[in-house]
């Protein structure tokens, strides 16, 4: 948020900046959006990590006249109808790049466990598509939930999910995570199990 505050200083038309953190809880994130609209904000830039579950709240903000810009993870819907515009990231490309790295560093193939944020988020779903495209026709196999094991990008939940996966799958060769801090905290569980 410090970087955002610095950027806002460069824009004289922004007179007040509010910040909210849904803390990985969809109901809190929805309440935060509603609260911002109730405060009378003119614009809302929002990371809808819960994906399509956020669309009704974003649509309501847009219909209330708030410039509404979700970014990175798509909430579904249509720009100009459900929100002002969407600023995206090419997550499939990220997944393809990870796949190339995996082929180079684990060339014999193996079992891949993928961790991502909340269930249904477009980031993890698109990254998985990119991974699958990159690894097609190879000896790699995805294990765990499809498209990924949901962690909510929460370090504690990531540790819980990884511990359960280690107990369930005796051989995990590659762990893919799209949120480093979450994975780092979970690696202690992996080390303890050998």
Predicted regions located by residue number:
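A residue-level marker of the well-folded mature domains of exported/periplasmic proteins
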Residues: 1-194
């Amino acid at each position: 948020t410090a970087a955002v505050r610095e950027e806002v200083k460069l824009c004289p038309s922004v007179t007040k900046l509010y910040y909210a953190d849904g803390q990985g809880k969809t109901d809190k994130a929805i309440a935060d959006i509603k609260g911002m609209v109730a405060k009378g904000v003119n614009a809302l830039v929002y990371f809808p990590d819960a994906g399509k579950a956020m669309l009704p709240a974003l649509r309501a903000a847009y219909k209330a006249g708030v410039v509404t810009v979700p970014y990175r993870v798509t909430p579904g819907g249509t720009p100009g109808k459900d929100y002002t515009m969407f600023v995206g990231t090419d997550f499939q490309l990220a997944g393809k790049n990870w796949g190339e790295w995996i082929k180079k560093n684990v060339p014999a193939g193996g079992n891949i466990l993928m961790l991502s944020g909340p269930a249904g988020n477009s980031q993890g779903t698109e990254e998985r598509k990119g991974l699958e495209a990159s690894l097609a026709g190879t000896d790699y196999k995805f294990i765990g939930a499809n498209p990924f094991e949901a962690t909510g990008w929460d370090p504690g939940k990531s540790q819980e999910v990884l511990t359960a996966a280690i107990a369930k799958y005796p051989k995990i060769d590659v762990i893919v995570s799209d949120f480093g801090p979450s994975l780092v905290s979970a690696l202690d569980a992996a080390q303890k199990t050998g």
